[in-house]
Swiss-Prot record:
Its EC number is 6.3.2.17. GO terms for molecular function: ATP binding; metal ion binding; tetrahydrofolylpolyglutamate synthase activity. Activated by 10 mM sodium bicarbonate. Disulfide bonds: none annotated. This is Folylpolyglutamate synthase, mitochondrial.
């Protein structure tokens, strides 16, 4: 590591230690906690997770996919081989009555809505999603709940040993991390005899390992945007081609309103595969003639996800003869770019209940704890960041203003992978934060005690330097002090409503200050300043110079009548914050 990088890292640890009152850099490296560490699940479960972590992790898997991208059939054949070695054939997956969902933003929320709607009918549901926020078992759910540590442990070791026993010289012993969990989910759902499985695509669609599913009941494509460009392509049209790879001959598919280019690609892809593709009407069309629909997830953008989920659930019920019969029929063929409009129907009481009861942590989630309000939304693409800002500003507009002192706004941000942090931060800047805080996706500097939070794909140096780069991007934007308020113009999204946009926050008298911390717990301790009972206040530093922003900001945060903290960017950052704010999630 260069001398400059060494100095940067030393400065970072110094700032973190100053904010927490740790007297040596060694203590900061050890991740000493100022509050009791929540009791971890049984070591047997943790042992299973540690063994899972020894497999090729997601970042390595992405690199492998990039190398093999020219021959997608090889990837799917490899997944089918793993499936066979585990004791299943692709035909066995037909029994799961799968709903297969892809998209760039909103696919997880769409899946959550869909699963909750169908569960409200009394059906036993399986739900496979990624990534996890706090514990890896969140990725595999039965009836909306993560499988228990005991169930995870049982199925993990059963699959692991079966794959070990079937290895030979012609095949690799174990599938990569994500493929292993996909296989495990299929085994869990089959053994636990679910009535249906909602399966969220990992990355893309055409080459994704979930695409060994050959006969889903119905497929869905949520809103498209730019993400994973090194894998999927650098235009929305290229990404749409990848997403359309989950279409199957004769299997109905639904999508929401997209820009003309990617929508045309989806249409052509569906025609080539002989897949009937339908365009979802707006949620307002389904509300006509009845009371408004109440959504369990906040944010105007969730209405698009809910509209798609209603069509997926309605189609599944029809095709399974659970509620009505017959294929979806277009009400007005050729409505838009030669795509038929999906049927407009009156949502049933079960559908309304499912939409209202949907929970999806880390997405437009609000936690209120005394004077602190935490706004959590894992928005890591430009379009998701736009939706996040609209939701955040709308939430602030509807709040009760305190009378006993000033309000403070804090941004807690991190971005990983091939995302463009400068572009994301520019979208967030008009929220007029008083402080911008950056930290890696580490709950503590040392994560050895929690296997669920371990990440072997990057080094500590890499993640710390990336945070410093984020800070530099933010400071550069702050120095310009001329960033236009992007939210005073009409929504760029198809079907968006300018009436939902908020007036700009009155400009502050001074620019936002920025800080970098070495882990999430250090950042949360500084932000909360002892006003959240979970976190002990940082003690005065001994023998170290106090970072001026940390010192001045601490006084302001302690005196504020209300502190609004937006946690966004990486979902893993959101998960780490949730783990610390809600220790029960780790039990």
């Amino acid at each position: 590591m260069s001398r400059a990088r060494s100095h940067l890292r030393a400065a970072l640890f110094l700032a973190a230690a100053s904010a927490r009152g740790i007297t040596t850099q060694v203590a900061a490296r050890r991740g000493l906690s100022a509050w009791p560490v929540p009791q971890e699940p049984s070591m047997e479960y943790q042992d299973a997770v540690r063994m899972l972590n020894t497999l090729q992790t997601n970042a390595g898997y992405l690199e492998q996919v990039k190398r093999q991208r020219g021959d997608p059939q090889t990837q799917l054949e490899a997944m089918e081989l793993y499936l066979a070695r585990s004791g299943l054939q692709v035909e066995d997956l037909d029994r799961l009555n799968i709903i297969h969902v892809t998209g760039t933003k909103g696919k997880g929320s769409t899946c959550a809505f869909t699963e909750c709607i169908l569960r409200s009918y009394g059906l036993k549901t399986g739900f496979f999603s990624s990534p996890h926020l706090v514990q890896v078992r969140e990725r595999i759910r039965i009836n909306g709940q993560p499988i228990s540590p005991e169930l995870f442990t049982k199925y993990f070791w059963r699959l692991y040993h079966r794959l070990e026993e079937t290895k030979d010289g012609s095949c690799v012993s174990m599938p990569p991390y994500f493929r292993f969990l996909t296989l495990m989910a299929f085994h869990v759902f089959l053994q636990e005899k679910v009535d249906l499985a909602v399966v969220e695509v990992g990355i893309g669609g055409a080459y994704d390992c979930t695409n060994i599913i050959r006969k889903p009941v119905v497929c869905g494509v949520s809103s498209l945007g730019i993400d994973h460009t090194s894998l999927l392509g650098d235009t929305v049209e290229k990404i749409a081609w990848q997403k359309g790879g989950i279409f199957k001959q004769g299997v109905p598919a639904f999508t929401v309103l997209q820009p003309e280019g990617p929508l045309a690609v989806l249409r052509d892809r569906a025609q080539q595969i002989s897949c009937p593709l339908y365009l979802c009407p707006m949620l307002e069309a389904l509300e006509e003639g009845g009371p408004p629909l109440t959504l369990g997830l906040e944010g105007e953008h969730q209405r698009s996800n809910a509209a798609l989920a209603l069509q997926l659930a309605h189609c599944w019920l029809q095709r399974q003869d659970r509620h009505g019969a017959g294929e979806p029929k277009a009400s007005r063929p050729g409505l838009l770019w030669q795509l038929p409009l999906a049927p407009v129907f009156q949502p049933t009481s079960h559908m309304r209940l499912g939409l209202r009861n949907t929970e999806w942590p880390g997405r437009t989630q609000v936690l209120r704890r005394g004077p602190l309000t935490w706004y959590l939304d894992g928005a890591h693409t430009a379009s998701s960041a736009q939706a996040c800002v609209r939701w955040f500003r709308q939430a602030l507009q509807g709040r009760e203003r305190p009378s006993g002192g000033p309000e403070v706004r804090v941004l807690l941000f991190n971005a990983t992978g091939d995302r463009d942090p400068a572009a994301l931060l520019k979208l967030l800047q008009p929220c007029q934060f008083d402080y911008a805080v950056f930290c890696p996706n580490l709950t503590e500097v040392s994560s050895t005690g929690n296997a669920d939070q371990q990440n072997f794909t990057v080094t500590l140096d890499q993640v710390l330097l990336r945070c410093l780069e984020h800070q530099q991007h933010w400071n550069h934007l702050d120095e310009e002090q001329a960033s236009p308020d992007l939210w005073s113009a009409p929504s760029p999204e198809p079907g968006g409503s300018a009436s939902l946009l908020l007036a700009p926050h009155p400009p502050h008298t001074c620019s936002a200050s920025s800080l970098v911390f070495s882990c999430i717990s250090h950042a949360l301790q500084w932000i909360s300043q002892g006003r959240d009972p979970i976190f002990q206040p940082p003690s005065p530093p001994k023998g170290l110079l106090t970072h001026p922003v940390a010192h001045s900001g601490a006084s302001i945060l302690r005196e504020a009548a209300a502190i609004h903290v937006l946690v966004t960017g990486s979902l893993h950052l959101v998960g780490g914050v949730l783990k610390l704010l809600e220790p029960a999630l780790s039990q």
